[in-house]
């Protein structure tokens, strides 16, 4: 049935998609492509609604029940949802928004899906999204659309696990798509919404909404990183104009702040990766070339890896050589085994590592170069690879705004040997896995300055706050405020 679509959209629909049926409407269920333009999933939904001669609308929801749900993630997602609601309205596309909370926990999506001719969604090959996909597919035809990678996710039928082989396979696809403008599909009918009590986010008090959700209120919002298309475009435009040309030179020094810091906007789809790639291709500098390689090769390799390895959160996904060498070196005596709490609070006593964790704790992000040091430190600091992987995923997904992304899994698994090759000679703790020692990395930049920057308040302006009251609640409130700076 994807033959009803133009080629540039058909290639983005998962193969063997089920045929639409008789139904009242087409639903675009958006999750990680929360933008109103340059959105292949939205365009597929609009095109199919025209073909089926039924209305189309966008369904967007925020659950309390995903792992690591917190004030930080909820706030960022709601800020993005507010922009999306506004932008869809401006384009004449109907939309509804549901925030799961005590007042309303009904399964609205399943109720709407049962009435739909077709449900279209943007695919991300990680949990819990894959589980949710299966639940919807059980009651309605579901088309999963790649709205996140320049080279369509379905173009690679077999797994590729090294950057050079993935780059070689993907380059022809990138080259024919890189500079092509994206032409949005226009709605064929007036805005439509079903009988649904939608939340109007333009008038909503977002902090009050978040406070009413049954989520982790101990992970505070990052006030200097607002979610949404406007904020994402602003951050990208600033980097494009001021930082892209020097990216190749400055990107490895976290003190110089030579990176784009757009990963959270790409993760939630507030910013179009096609726009970013197109801008880079037109820049024609060494920095743009290097940035494009990171955006396409490494980011899309991680998506490809997660698609072909649904067990990407388990140690068994590591290559056999990596599992074996790490297991053999479990016998190496560990001089330091910090507790989870020491790690989470950034209280290991190692200045560089603690500053990295402070970056996650207070700012919801971690510079990519020190992220590798942060991740590999847990090989000698934990009992085995299984524990290291579990703790790294937890620390990253709990605090990072771009957590739970295929890129997060790719980067963390790389620390343990995935997407890499064996190294010789073997070293203590790491065996044949590429080693990276915090003490050695600390010699390469000004760690004291990095520490100072990571301890800046997340609000931008320091606040003096007194927490009055004792007990567990008072202690938790004080710690949350301290984490946020």
Predicted features and spans:
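Glycine/tryptophan-enriched, flexible segments
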Residues: 21-22, 152-154, 159-317, 449-450
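Active-site-proximal binding-pocket segments
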Residues: 253-446
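N-terminal Rossmann-like FAD-binding beta1-loop-alpha1 element of flavoenzymes
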Residues: 462-485
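Trp/Phe/Arg-rich N-terminal binding region typifying the photolyase-homology
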Residues: 1-181, 185-186, 287, 358, ...
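Short, flexible loop/turn elements at secondary-structure junctions
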Residues: 30-34, 99, 123-125, 146-149, ...
């Amino acid at each position: 049935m994807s033959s009803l679509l133009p080629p540039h959209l058909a290639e983005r629909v998962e193969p063997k998609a089920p045929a639409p049926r008789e139904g009242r409407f087409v639903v675009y269920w958006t999750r990680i492509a929360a933008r109103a333009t340059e959105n292949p999933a939205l365009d597929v939904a609009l095109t199919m609604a025209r073909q089926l001669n039924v209305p189309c609308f966008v369904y967007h929801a925020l659950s309390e029940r995903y792992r690591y749900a917190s004030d930080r993630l909820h706030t960022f997602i709601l800020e993005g949802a507010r922009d999306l609601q506004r932008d869809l309205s401006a384009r004449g596309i109907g939309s509804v928004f549901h925030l799961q909370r005590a007042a309303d926990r009904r399964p609205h999506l399943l109720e709407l899906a049962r009435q739909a001719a077709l449900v279209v969604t943007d695919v991300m090959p990680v949990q819990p999204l894959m589980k949710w996909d299966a639940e919807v597919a059980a009651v309605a035809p579901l088309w999963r659309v790649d709205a996140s990678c320049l080279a369509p996710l379905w173009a690679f039928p077999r797994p590729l696990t090294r950057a050079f082989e993935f780059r070689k396979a993907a380059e022809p696809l990138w080259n024919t798509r890189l500079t092509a403008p994206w032409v949005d599909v226009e709605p064929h009918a007036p805005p439509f919404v079903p009988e649904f009590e939608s939340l109007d986010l333009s008038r909503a008090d977002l902090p009050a909404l978040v406070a009413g959700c049954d989520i982790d209120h101990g992970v505070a919002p990052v006030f200097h990183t607002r979610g949404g298309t406007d904020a994402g475009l602003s951050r990208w435009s600033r980097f494009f104009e001021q930082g892209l040309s020097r990216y190749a030179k400055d990107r490895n020094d976290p003190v110089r702040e030579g990176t784009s810091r757009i990963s959270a906007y790409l993760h939630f789809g507030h910013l179009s990766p096609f726009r970013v790639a197109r801008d880079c291709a037109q820049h024609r500098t060494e920095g743009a070339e290097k940035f494009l390689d990171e955006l396409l090769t490494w980011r899309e390799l991680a998506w490809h890896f997660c698609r072909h390895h649904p067990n990407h959160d388990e140690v068994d996904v590591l290559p056999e050589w990596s599992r074996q060498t790490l297991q053999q070196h479990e016998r190496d005596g560990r001089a330091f085994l910090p507790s989870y709490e020491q790690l989470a609070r950034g209280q290991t006593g190692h200045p560089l590592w603690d500053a990295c964790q402070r970056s996650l704790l207070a700012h919801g992000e971690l510079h990519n170069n020190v992220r590798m040091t942060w991740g590999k430190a847990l090989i000698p600091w934990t009992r085995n690879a299984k524990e290291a992987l579990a703790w790294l995923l937890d620390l990253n997904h709990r605090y990072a705004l771009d957590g739970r992304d295929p890129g997060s899994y790719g980067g963390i698994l790389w620390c343990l040997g995935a997407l890499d090759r064996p190294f010789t000679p073997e070293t203590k703790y790491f065996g044949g896995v590429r080693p990276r020692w915090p003490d050695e990395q600390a010699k390469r930049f000004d760690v004291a300055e990095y520490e100072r920057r990571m301890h800046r308040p997340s609000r931008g302006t320091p606040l003096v706050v007194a927490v009055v009251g004792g007990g567990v609640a008072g202690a938790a409130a004080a710690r949350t405020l301290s984490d946020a700076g």
